[in-house]
């Protein structure tokens, strides 16, 4: 996509693409002339405060979190008051980090190419200093980091405006010593800039934060905790999209397409499922605008931009392969401890207290798996949650289980005239569960009970319906599942029997939850460990609501 956009600019500054209208973009940096975007102005104002203060800092967020879009917009935002030099370390190959001499000459060459770009030259720097850098990097066989930074200091001293250096994908560097020495030079000039001219601000962008860059490159304990980038200011600017920001993007789309959508309602739905994760927001919108609209299931875009159209896009998103999900699942394989932590949150309802010094929590936060909420660690958003549930429920072991096969074989009877009979689902689950596991009660626990019901439910609704777990209700005793199927919604509470008093409170909680969803019927699946339990299914009248309860 980056190459495509570059070609368009070469052929007419984006006019050809503009003639086609703007679109939602999920590959490469976004351009407001070409793409529907959330307004970044407030974010840029906050980042500029750091630049104006002369801070060096890292913009570290998970993959596809809008970092590149932000720094490209920032470079444009700062250009009237600063000389902004924006580099991308992906343009420097691994072999060019082999030693300090090779890296220094490569960096100088890339630095000069960026400044002297014929189409977008960077002005305000002395030509004789640039020529000096060019000559030294080519002719001096001993040219290294020390000499590179002496000339860069001279360049900053003679520039017409303060110089800002931005490096995207800074953590793509692979040779530990060379990269750490580069950071050390930046640090040294920062600390001595009262007597040695230096960059006004240096911004590194990547997935890893300053401490974790050291961890990635030098995993031994001593260097992990002794980063040469310890001068960096804290970066606290919010990079996720707010519901208001999403609504602003949808207003621009609506002005072009007149779908009649409920903009605030749609923005709320998108935010509820994504928590403002930039790629997920844009991906859902793109799927609605293109794939769902062209699927033939909706007569026009007015029908697409509704809750049903939104859920259709969510279903597509949850079943597609993309680089974000591949990275997400890949990290579970790379870090077994992270996998165990995520599994415990999802299936056991374990409340994990946020501790920034705990390795797996740190990794989960860095890679975007998790967020901090009320002092605890939670999965970052609903889309990630369901994708992770699906991953754990789709292993070969899970799909070969008897309970999964029983659901697959029974699926046709649960769907009548396009409607899901949830009462029958619970009834058959009780029968199958009792038949399969009644002789293995000693091996059963709450965590397995939840997993087995989800194993049973998923093939029944797969391909047509969606589900998610209400994170606020998930704990070691209770979990609420929300199922959307062909325009109908079902609330199922999974809980462990803790006596009549607790059970009655659970019924009241479910009744209140039905109020929230404006539903008259709810479902409860109780796991009862008592020897004399009475398994089966019954209906309970709660005022004007009906509760279908199944006990296993």
Residue ranges and their predicted role:
Residues 481-483, 487-498, 513:
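Conserved catalytic cores of phosphodiester-cleaving nucleases, focusing on short active-site segments
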Residues 503-507, 514-542:
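Nucleic-acid nuclease catalytic cores
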Residues 456-487:
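Active-site metal-binding core of divalent-cation-utilizing nuclease and nuclease-like domains
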Residues 242-367, 373-374, 401-412:
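Winged-helix-like regulatory helical subdomains adjacent to P-loop NTPase cores
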Residues 27-29, 174-273, 287, 291-320:
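The catalytic "switch" region of P-loop NTPases
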Residues 49, 53-65, 69-182, 200, ...:
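P-loop NTPase nucleotide-binding core
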Residues 14-77, 150, 154, 428, ...:
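Walker A/P-loop-proximal flanking segment of P-loop NTPase domains
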Residues 428-468:
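Acidic-basic catalytic patches of nuclease active cores, encompassing PD-(D/E)XK
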């Amino acid at each position: 996509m980056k190459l495509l956009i570059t070609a368009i600019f070469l052929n007419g500054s984006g006019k050809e693409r503009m003639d086609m209208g703007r679109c939602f973009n999920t590959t490469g940096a976004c351009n407001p002339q070409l793409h529907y975007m959330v307004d970044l102005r407030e974010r840029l104002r906050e980042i500029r405060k750091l630049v104006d203060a002369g801070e060096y800092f890292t913009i570290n967020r998970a993959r596809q979190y809008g970092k590149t879009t932000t720094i490209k917009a920032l470079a444009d935002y700062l250009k009237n008051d600063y000389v902004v030099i924006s580099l991308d370390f992906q343009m420097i190959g691994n072999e060019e980090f082999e030693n300090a001499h090779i890296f220094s000459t490569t960096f100088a060459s890339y630095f000069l190419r960026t400044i002297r770009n014929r189409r977008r030259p960077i002005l305000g720097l002395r030509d004789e200093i640039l020529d000096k850098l060019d000559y030294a990097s080519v002719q001096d066989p001993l040219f290294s980091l020390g000499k590179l930074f002496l000339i860069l200091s001279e360049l900053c001293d003679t520039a017409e405006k303060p110089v800002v250096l931005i490096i995207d994908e800074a953590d793509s560097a692979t040779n530990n010593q060379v990269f750490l020495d580069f950071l050390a030079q930046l640090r040294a000039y920062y600390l001595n800039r009262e007597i040695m001219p230096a960059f006004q601000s240096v911004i590194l962008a990547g997935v890893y934060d300053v401490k974790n860059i050291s961890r990635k490159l030098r995993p031994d304990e001593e260097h992990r905790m002794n980063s040469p980038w310890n001068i960096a200011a804290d970066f606290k600017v919010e990079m996720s999209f707010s519901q208001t920001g999403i609504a602003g993007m949808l207003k621009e789309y609506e002005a072009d397409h007149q779908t009649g959508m409920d903009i605030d309602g749609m923005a709320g739905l998108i935010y509820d499922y994504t928590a403002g994760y930039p790629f997920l927001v844009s991906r859902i919108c793109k799927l609605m605008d293109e794939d769902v609209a062209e699927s033939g299931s909706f007569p026009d875009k007015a029908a697409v931009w509704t809750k049903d159209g939104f859920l259709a896009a969510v279903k597509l998103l949850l079943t597609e392969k993309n680089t974000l999900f591949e990275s997400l699942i890949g990290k579970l394989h790379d870090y077994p401890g992270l996998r165990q932590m995520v599994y415990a949150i999802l299936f056991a309802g374990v409340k994990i207290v946020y501790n920034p010094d705990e390795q797996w929590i740190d990794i989960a936060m860095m890679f975007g798996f998790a967020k901090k909420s009320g002092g605890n660690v939670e999965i970052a958003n609903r889309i990630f949650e369901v994708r992770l549930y699906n991953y754990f429920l789709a292993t070969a072991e899970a799909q070969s289980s008897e309970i999964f096969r029983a659901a697959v074989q029974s699926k046709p009877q649960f769907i009548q005239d396009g409607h899901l009979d949830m009462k029958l689902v619970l009834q058959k689950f009780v029968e199958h569960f009792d038949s399969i596991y009644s002789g293995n009660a000693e091996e059963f626990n709450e965590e397995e009970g939840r997993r087995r019901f989800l194993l049973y439910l998923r093939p029944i609704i797969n391909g047509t319906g969606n589900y998610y777990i209400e994170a606020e209700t998930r704990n070691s005793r209770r979990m609420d599942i929300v199922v959307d199927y062909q325009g109908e919604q079902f609330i199922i509470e999974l809980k462990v029997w803790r006596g009549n008093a607790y059970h009655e409170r659970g019924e009241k909680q479910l009744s209140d939850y039905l109020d929230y969803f404006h539903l008259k019927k709810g479902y409860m699946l109780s796991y009862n460990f008592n020897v004399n339990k009475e398994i089966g299914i019954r209906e309970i009248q709660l005022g004007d609501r009906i509760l279908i309860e199944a006990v296993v």
